[in-house]
C-alpha cells in the first residue's frame, strides 16, 4: 500500500514539472513586454503620431484576432496574481497546429544554427507528414519596393508625367499592369508565400494601400499566402499625392502603424503566433520548421524618416525568438526594409540601419545565415566581415538587398530551403511580354518590354543628368549623361560592371576632362566598384 502511495506521489510530481516547463516556455514567448517583465496586451501595437493622445514612447493597443494570441494572453485580465499568464496552448501544440493547417509542409527538422547537429525532434512521429508524402522544404517569392500606384490616382496628364520624369526610372504608368503580371506569375509558380519587404505604395497614399490590399487578397484567396511589412514610403508620408491636370495635389495618407495594420492585418499579421508589441514586427511560420522574422525598421512615430532603425524593444523580442528557434532546430530568415550592412559607396546615408552594430551582433550570436532587405533601389549581395582580414570562409551574416520591382528590369527573388537547412536564392525578371500576349494587349511597350524598358529608364536618368551639366555642347552632354544612365541601369539591376570598357568610352573621357570633380564623375567610380560581379545568385555556405 505504501509503495502505491509513493508511485501516485511520483506521478503528480512529474506532472507538475511538465506543466511548469510548459508555462516557462510560454512565458518566454508570450505576453511579457521585452525588457520589462510586465504583461502587455498582445496586439499589432504601434507607436502613434506625436500629435495624438499618446506621448513619446507610448503606444496604442488595437484589438486583435484570437489567431494572433497563441503565445500571449491577449488580455490584461488574464494575468494571475503571481504574474503567470493563463496560457491554454503549449509551444508543441502550436507546432502541431501548424502541421495540421499545412499538412504538405512535412516534419520539423534542420540544423541548429551554431550547433551543427540535427534537432532531436526531427524523427518524432507526431511531427511527420500526416499524408505520408515526402517532405518538400518551402520556397518563397520576394518582392521589394513595389511602389504601387493605382490608375485611379492620376489622369495620365501633365502632373503625372512630370512626376515620372523627375523620378528614378519607375514605370508608374504601368503599375496596374505590372501588378496583374506579378499576380499571374505568383499563381503560376505557387510559392509557399509571396513576401513584400516594404515600400509597397508610391508614397503611402491611402487609396493606393486599399487598392493594393484588394489585389493581394485575390492572390491569397487563390491559395498563395501573402506576407507584408512596411517601408519608409508607406506610413506618415506627406508626399502622398494625386496627379490630375497640371499640378499634383495632396492625398490622404496613413498616419500610424495601426492604420497600416488595419489594412494589411490579414497578410501575415493574423497568421503570426507572436507579434512585437512595440512595432509592426512579427513571426510568420512558413511551415513548422521555417520562420520569417518580419522586422519593422521604419521610423514613422514623429513624422516620416527615410532612414531605418530596429527599436531596442524589438531587438529584445527578436532575441527571444532567435533563441527559441535555435533550441527547436527551426530555420529563421529575418527580413526588413532597411539594409543591415553598408551596401553602397554611392548611397551612404539613410540606407543602413542606424543601429546596425547591435542588430548584426544579435543575428551573428545565433549564427543567422541571411538577412533580406530592400530600400536601396539596387540589388546587392554582401557578407559581413567582423574585422579586416577575416577569411572569406569564416562565418558572417550575409545580406541580400532586393532590386526594386518598380524599376525595370522589374525583378523579384526566389528563395528555397533544402532538407539540410541550406538556402538558394536567385533573381528573375518579370516576363511582361508573355503576359501582355496572354491578355491580348496591343501596347507595343508591353509587348516589347525587355527591349523598351531599359531605354525608358536610361532616358529618364539621362535627361536628369544633362540638366546639371553646363558650359558643354548638347551633343557632348548627351554622350556624358548617356554613359552615366547606362551604368545606373546595370547598377540597379545588379549586373556586373568593369572599368576596362568604361574607360574606353568617349563619355567617360569627357567626364574626366571637363568635370573631374563632379558628383556624377565620382558616382561612376562608386557604381563600378560596388558591382564587380553579377549579383543574382546566392547559396548558403555548407559550413553554415
Locate the predicted segments by residue.
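Non-catalytic terminal accessory segments
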Residues: 2-69, 73-132, 437-544
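N-terminal active-site segment of His-dependent metallophosphoesterases
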Residues: 86-110, 114-116, 120-206
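Active-site-proximal beta-strand elements of phosphoester/diester hydrolases
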Residues: 137-150, 289-300, 335, 398-403, ...
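Active-site environment of divalent metal-dependent phosphoester hydrolases
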Residues: 149-152, 202-204, 232-240, 300-303, ...
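His/acidic metal-ligating clusters that form di-metal
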Residues: 187-193, 291-293, 305-398
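Metal-dependent catalytic neighborhoods of phosphoester/phosphodiester hydrolases
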Residues: 197-217, 237-257, 344-352, 380-389
Amino acid at each position: 500500500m505504501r509503495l502505491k502511495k509513493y508511485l501516485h506521489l511520483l506521478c503528480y510530481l512529474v506532472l507538475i514539472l511538465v506543466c511548469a516547463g510548459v508555462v516557462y516556455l510560454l512565458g518566454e514567448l508570450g505576453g511579457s513586454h521585452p525588457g520589462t517583465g510586465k504583461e502587455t496586451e498582445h496586439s499589432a501595437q504601434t507607436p502613434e503620431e506625436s500629435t495624438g493622445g499618446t506621448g513619446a514612447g507610448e503606444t496604442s493597443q488595437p484589438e486583435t484576432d484570437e489567431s494572433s494570441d497563441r503565445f500571449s494572453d491577449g488580455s490584461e485580465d488574464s494575468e494571475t496574481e503571481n504574474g503567470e499568464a493563463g496560457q491554454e496552448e503549449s509551444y508543441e501544440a502550436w507546432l502541431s497546429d501548424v502541421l495540421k493547417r499545412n499538412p504538405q509542409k512535412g516534419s520539423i527538422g534542420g540544423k541548429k544554427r551554431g550547433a551543427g547537429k540535427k534537432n532531436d525532434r526531427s524523427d518524432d512521429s507526431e511531427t511527420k507528414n500526416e499524408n505520408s508524402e515526402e517532405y518538400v522544404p518551402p520556397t518563397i517569392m520576394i518582392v521589394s519596393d513595389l511602389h504601387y500606384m493605382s490608375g485611379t490616382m492620376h489622369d495620365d496628364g501633365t502632373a503625372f508625367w512630370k512626376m515620372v520624369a523627375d523620378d528614378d526610372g519607375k514605370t508608374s504608368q504601368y503599375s496596374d499592369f505590372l501588378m496583374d503580371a506579378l499576380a499571374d506569375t505568383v499563381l503560376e509558380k505557387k510559392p509557399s508565400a509571396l513576401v513584400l519587404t516594404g515600400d509597397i505604395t508610391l508614397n503611402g497614399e491611402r487609396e493606393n494601400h486599399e487598392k493594393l490590399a484588394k489585389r493581394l487578397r485575390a492572390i491569397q484567396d487563390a491559395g498563395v499566402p501573402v506576407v507584408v511589412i512596411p517601408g519608409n514610403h508607406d506610413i506618415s508620408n506627406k508626399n502622398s499625392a494625386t496627379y490630375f491636370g497640371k499640378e499634383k495635389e495632396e492625398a490622404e495618407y496613413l498616419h500610424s502603424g495601426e492604420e497600416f495594420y488595419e489594412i494589411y492585418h490579414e497578410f501575415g499579421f493574423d497568421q503570426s503566433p507572436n507579434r512585437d508589441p512595440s512595432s509592426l514586427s512579427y513571426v510568420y511560420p512558413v511551415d513548422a520548421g521555417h520562420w520569417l522574422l518580419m522586422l519593422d525598421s521604419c521610423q514613422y512615430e514623429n513624422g516620416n524618416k527615410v532612414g531605418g532603425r530596429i527599436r531596442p524593444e524589438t531587438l529584445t523580442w527578436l532575441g527571444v525568438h532567435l533563441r527559441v528557434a535555435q533550441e527547436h532546430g527551426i530555420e529563421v530568415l529575418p527580413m526588413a526594409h532597411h539594409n543591415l550592412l553598408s551596401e553602397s559607396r554611392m548611397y551612404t546615408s539613410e540606407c543602413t540601419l542606424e543601429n546596425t552594430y547591435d542588430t548584426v551582433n544579435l543575428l551573428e550570436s545565433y549564427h543567422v545565415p541571411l538577412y533580406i532587405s530592400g530600400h536601396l533601389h539596387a540589388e546587392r549581395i554582401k557578407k559581413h566581415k567582423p574585422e579586416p582580414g577575416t577569411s572569406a570562409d569564416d562565418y558572417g551574416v550575409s545580406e541580400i538587398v532586393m532590386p526594386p520591382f518598380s524599376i525595370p528590369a522589374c525583378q523579384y527573388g526566389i528563395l528555397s530551403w533544402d532538407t539540410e537547412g541550406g538556402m538558394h536564392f536567385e533573381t528573375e525578371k518579370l516576363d511582361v511580354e508573355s503576359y501582355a500576349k496572354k491578355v491580348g494587349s496591343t501596347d507595343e511597350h508591353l509587348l516589347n518590354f525587355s527591349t523598351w524598358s531599359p531605354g525608358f529608364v536610361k532616358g529618364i536618368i539621362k535627361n536628369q543628368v544633362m540638366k546639371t551639366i553646363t558650359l558643354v555642347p548638347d551633343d557632348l552632354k548627351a554622350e556624358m549623361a548617356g554613359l552615366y544612365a547606362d551604368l545606373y541601369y546595370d547598377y540597379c539591376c545588379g549586373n556586373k560592371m568593369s572599368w576596362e570598357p568604361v574607360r574606353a568610352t568617349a563619355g567617360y573621357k569627357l567626364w574626366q576632362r571637363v568635370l573631374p570633380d563632379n558628383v556624377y564623375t565620382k558616382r561612376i567610380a562608386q557604381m563600378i566598384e560596388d558591382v564587380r560581379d553579377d549579383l543574382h545568385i546566392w547559396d548558403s555556405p555548407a559550413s553554415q
